[in-house]
């Protein structure tokens, strides 16, 4: 019994070693670490003075979904300033406007 358990543990150890060194080929390959300048060839080196521009993010930023409520402010007009845009109707004015329209139709 002890012999069979020791035999089974040996193949498992060899499998783990193979997995560590052997590439599986699934998914995206890992990014290779940058090569140190000492090992790189002199002819293929880029100029150190050249600084690449950082990539700008595309599209909508991630955290901008639910910020509409925080940015909105009340539409209060300061005294002496005219309100911009179309004036808002109050509930009373709406009711009066409807009653005036119906009375105009009768006449």
Curated annotation (Swiss-Prot):
GO terms for cellular component: nucleus; senescence-associated heterochromatin focus. Residues 15-24 have a biased composition (Basic and acidic residues). Residues 53-77 are annotated as: Interaction with HIPK2. The modification Asymmetric dimethylarginine is found at residues 26, 58, 60. The modification ADP-ribosylserine is found at residues 8-9. Isoforms HMG-I and HMG-Y can be phosphorylated by HIPK2. Phosphorylation may modulate DNA-binding affinity. There is a cross-link at residue 15 (Glycyl lysine isopeptide (Lys-Gly) (interchain with G-Cter in SUMO2)). The modification N6-acetyllysine is found at residues 7, 15. The modification N-acetylserine is found at residue 2. Keywords: Acetylation, ADP-ribosylation, Chromosome, DNA-binding, Isopeptide bond, Methylation, Nucleus, Phosphoprotein, Repeat, Transcription, Transcription regulation, Ubl conjugation. GO terms for molecular function: DNA binding; nuclear retinoic acid receptor binding; nuclear retinoid X receptor binding; peroxisome proliferator activated receptor binding; transcription coactivator activity; transcription coregulator binding. InterPro entries: AT_hook_DNA-bd_motif, HMGA, HMGI/Y_DNA-bd_CS. The modification Phosphothreonine is found at residues 39, 53. PROSITE patterns: HMGI_Y. Its main location: nucleus. The modification Phosphoserine is found at residues 9, 36, 44, 49, 99, 102-103. The modification Symmetric dimethylarginine is found at residue 26. Residues 1-107 are annotated as: Disordered. The modification Omega-N-methylarginine is found at residues 26, 58, 60. PANTHER family: HIGH MOBILITY GROUP PROTEIN HMG-I_HMG-Y, HIGH MOBILITY GROUP PROTEINS HMG-A AND C. Interacts with HIPK2. Belongs to the HMGA family. HMG-I/Y bind preferentially to the minor groove of A+T rich regions in double-stranded DNA. It is suggested that these proteins could function in nucleosome phasing and in the 3'-end processing of mRNA transcripts. They are also involved in the transcription regulation of genes containing, or in close proximity to A+T-rich regions. This is High mobility group protein HMG-I/HMG-Y. It comes from Cricetulus griseus (Chinese hamster).
């Amino acid at each position: 019994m002890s012999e069979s358990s020791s035999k089974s543990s040996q193949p498992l150890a060899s499998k783990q070693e193979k997995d560590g060194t052997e590439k599986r080929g699934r998914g995206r390959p890992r990014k290779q670490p940058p090569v140190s300048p000492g090992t790189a060839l002199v002819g293929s080196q880029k100029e150190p003075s050249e600084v690449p521009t950082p990539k700008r993010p595309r599209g909508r930023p991630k955290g901008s979904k639910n910020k509409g409520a925080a940015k909105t402010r009340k539409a209060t007009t300061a005294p002496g300033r005219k309100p911009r845009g179309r004036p808002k109707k109050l509930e009373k004015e709406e009711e009066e406007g409807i009653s005036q329209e119906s009375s105009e139709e009768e006449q």
